[in-house]
């Protein structure tokens, strides 16, 4: 059985932290005479990331609510873990891309966000295991 856990909310924190740090960095980093925050591509990428992070957070909340209400929730917990961990990894990777070479430097938090996010696709059941749980709920046979 898959359970809703605090680590699923931690995933939200990793992704949100990466976004917050990236927004701050892009408002200070100047390229071509203006902060890179001013470029539409930067704004659109961060807006897309924020929307995905909030969607993942809502799925975690839905799974937690189902558990609290005594409803079947294994499939919801698996979906929450899958979406939240893969969203956190994608967001962290995209944030590193936005900040450029400094994204790999230990002087900035971006490389840590990427490492912290990637491991979440592995521990407490890999993304593939979560997909197996979801497929089982959909009626897949073993």
Residue ranges and their predicted role:
Residues 1-142:
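Alpha-helical interface subdomain recognition
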């Amino acid at each position: 059985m898959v359970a809703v856990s605090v680590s699923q909310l931690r995933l939200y924190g990793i992704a949100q932290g990466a976004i917050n740090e990236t927004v701050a960095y892009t408002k200070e980093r100047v390229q071509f005479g203006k902060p890179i925050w001013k470029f539409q591509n930067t704004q659109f990428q961060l807006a897309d990331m924020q929307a995905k992070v909030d969607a993942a957070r809502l799925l975690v909340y839905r799974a937690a609510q189902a558990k609290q209400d005594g409803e079947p929730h294994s499939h919801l917990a698996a979906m929450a873990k899958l979406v939240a961990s893969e969203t956190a990894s994608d967001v962290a990777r995209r944030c590193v891309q936005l900040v450029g070479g400094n994204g790999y430097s230990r002087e900035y938090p971006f490389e840590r966000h990427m490492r912290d996010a990637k491991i979440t696709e592995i521990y407490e059941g890999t993304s593939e295991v979560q997909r197996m749980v979801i497929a089982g709920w959909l009626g897949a046979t073993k």
